Amino acid sequence: MKKFISRPKRSSRRRKKTPIKPGENIDYKNVGLLRKFISEQGKILSKRITRLTSKQQRAMTKAIKSARILALLPFINNEN
């Protein structure tokens, strides 16, 4: 008689919700949204951390850089 080895069940992977709502536009003027994707030091967070798609990450990077040039966002956060 064969003995059956019980294997642990694999957990199903659920898609995590994207941090950007479908109606929200990635725009350099939307400073509140852009601040969510910048670290405390002022660096742009990676796609892996923010769970953005590649297309969204490119648009976010361009928007953050434009906002920095227009002095809407700081290049470096020096607040201690």
Swiss-Prot record:
Ranges of biased composition (kind: Basic residues): 1-19
Gene3D superfamilies: Ribosomal protein S18
SUPFAM superfamilies hit by this protein: Ribosomal protein S18
Family to which the UniProt record says this protein belongs: Belongs to the bacterial ribosomal protein bS18 family.
Coiled coil: none
Name of the protein in its database record: Small ribosomal subunit protein bS18c
One CC-aspect GO term: chloroplast
InterPro entries associated with the record: Ribosomal_bS18 (IPR001648), Ribosomal_bS18_CS (IPR018275), Ribosomal_bS18_sf (IPR036870)
Self-association and partners: Part of the 30S ribosomal subunit.
Keywords: Chloroplast, Plastid, Ribonucleoprotein, Ribosomal protein, RNA-binding, rRNA-binding
Region: Disordered, residue numbers: 1-24
GO terms of biological process kind: translation
Signal peptide per UniProt: none
Keyword Plastid: yes
Subcellular location: Plastid, Chloroplast
Source organism of the structure: Staurastrum punctulatum
GO molecular function terms listed in the Swiss-Prot or TrEMBL record: small ribosomal subunit rRNA binding; structural constituent of ribosome
Main location: plastid
